[in-house]
Regions:
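Cysteine-centric segments in proteins
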Residues: 1-56, 60-102
Length: 102
């Protein structure tokens, strides 16, 4: 089981004709000086555990995303990633994607 703590995060909901609706964490990490920003999307949300200052978001794969409540959002980089993924889904008629609340 892997654990991730993104610098910023949002919840996306993907609605596809084949699989229906699924919610996922889209997390991002700042690369720092000389590094590259990174993003990761989990396998799908199985359950959310409110831990006070943060949520433990458990994915279908068993991974846990530790999502701090004061870090909801995204960088310009992650915004581009989201828009590209959303456009690709729509261009090939595989579904839609939108930002939703936890």
């Amino acid at each position: 089981m892997s654990e991730y703590t993104p610098d910023l995060w949002v919840i996306v909901e993907i609605d596809s004709p084949e699989h229906g609706k699924i919610r996922k964490v889209l997390g991002s990490w700042y690369g720092g000086f000389g590094g590259s920003d990174e993003w990761r999307m989990n396998s799908g949300i199985e359950k959310v555990i409110d831990q006070g200052d943060y949520y433990d978001v458990v994915g279908y794969s068993g991974s846990i995303y530790k999502c701090y409540k004061n870090r909801v959002g995204w960088s310009a980089y992650t915004n581009r990633v989201y828009n590209n993924l959303k456009k690709e889904l729509e261009d090939i008629n595989m579904g839609t994607m939108e930002i939703v609340s936890i």
